[in-house]
């Protein structure tokens, strides 16, 4: 979470250049690479990246504060030639600010975008859902389905993700146990869904900031938010190689700090996902800063397969400076790297790779 409004004018101009309709692809500067390689970052700026692979195309989005933009590409490592479109510009003042962590999903032959927004006061952040019935999300129109009521007190919520397991759809998100007073604690909740925009069960708390590595909110230089913020946010669903273990990755500690990192919750695929006892938390982060590679505060995961389905890639944001944005312009940018598997068939996220390093493109990528 962030408690200050960023200076976004330059960033907005950059992302919107050439981003108006499907026929006009966005052109941007990128580091040179051979046709069969790529370099990070994907964009110079951008937080909370998310992508989906569907029918040979990748659909990518990330937070831009006042609008939702969607990119379409057959090569997720070459965003310089992706087609870009603004798919949502809110008009309702109650949800027109701080549009954070959009995620696109394809559910029952329709497209849905989940995101968080508020009225200018981040204490009023809530979850919202957009729907588009067009077969192509770059066509048709995204329309507001409404806000997701996460609990009877109309409590705070950000960074929702949804997944289906054994015919049941679930929503996971970051929320408060109660309204903030002098400090803030963000926790991971899960609930069953009646449809893509309505919960069908009470929310269930499955993770709260408890380890020291989950409770960092002061930067190395002493800069900090106005009050303590203890963070579990950005849940993202994944699975073991044999699909017998479900995984919810999440981000922990302040996103403005180099200590922002990735934690992991696991559950047996046969267990009751609404029972907190079904979930086991890793006692250590599974993806964190690399001093050697000068990558700080990695988090905000999203997973996509290679075009031929033989590999998995992780998209995340990170920064190249140790002290982050408690009041300065956005310093995070999105990156992508291949993941591996350990001897037990669990994902091995590795370490964040250095920006500017040359990496092989995902298997099956059509080279241009």
Regions found by a protein language model. Name each.
Residues 1-30:
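Bacterial Sec-dependent N-terminal signal peptides
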Residues 19-368:
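Carbohydrate-active catalytic/glycan-binding domains of CAZyme proteins
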């Amino acid at each position: 979470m962030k408690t200050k409004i960023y200076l976004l004018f330059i960033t907005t101009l950059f992302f919107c250049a050439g981003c108006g309709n499907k026929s006009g692809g966005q052109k941007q500067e990128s580091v040179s690479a051979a046709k069969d390689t790529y370099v990070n970052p994907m964009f110079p700026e951008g937080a909370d990246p998310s992508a989906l692979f569907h029918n040979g195309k990748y659909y990518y989005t990330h937070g831009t504060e006042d609008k939702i933009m969607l990119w379409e590409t057959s090569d997720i490592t070459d965003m310089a030639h992706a087609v870009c479109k603004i798919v949502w510009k809110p008009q309702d003042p109650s949800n027109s600010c701080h549009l954070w962590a959009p995620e696109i999903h394809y559910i029952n032959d329709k497209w849905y975008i989940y995101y968080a927004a508020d009225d200018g006061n981040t204490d009023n952040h809530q979850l919202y859902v957009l729907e588009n019935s067009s077969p192509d999300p770059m066509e048709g129109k995204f329309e507001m389905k409404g806000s997701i009521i996460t609990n009877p007190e109309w409590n705070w919520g950000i960074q929702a993700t949804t997944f289906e397991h054994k015919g049941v759809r679930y929503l996971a998100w970051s929320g408060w146990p109660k309204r903030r007073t002098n400090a803030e604690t963000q926790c991971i909740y899960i609930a069953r869904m009646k449809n893509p925009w309505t919960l069908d069960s009470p929310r269930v708390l499955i993770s709260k900031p408890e380890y020291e590595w989950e409770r960092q909110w002061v930067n190395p230089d002493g800069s900090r938010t106005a009050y303590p913020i203890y963070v579990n946010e950005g849940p993202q669903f994944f699975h073991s190689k044999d699909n017998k273990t479900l995984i919810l990755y999440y981000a922990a500690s302040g996103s403005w700090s180099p200590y922002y990192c990735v934690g992991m919750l696991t559950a047996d695929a046969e267990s009751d996902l609404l029972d907190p006892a079904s979930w086991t938390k890793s006692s250590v982060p599974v993806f964190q800063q690399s001093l050697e590679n000068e990558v700080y505060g990695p988090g905000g995961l999203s997973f996509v397969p290679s075009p031929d389905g033989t590999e998995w890639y992780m998209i995340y944001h990170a920064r190249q400076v140790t002290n982050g944005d408690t009041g300065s312009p956005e310093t995070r940018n999105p990156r992508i790297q291949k993941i591996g598997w350990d001897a037990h068939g669990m994902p091995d996220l590795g370490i964040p790779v250095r920006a500017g390093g040359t990496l092989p493109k995902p298997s099956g990528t059509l080279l241009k």
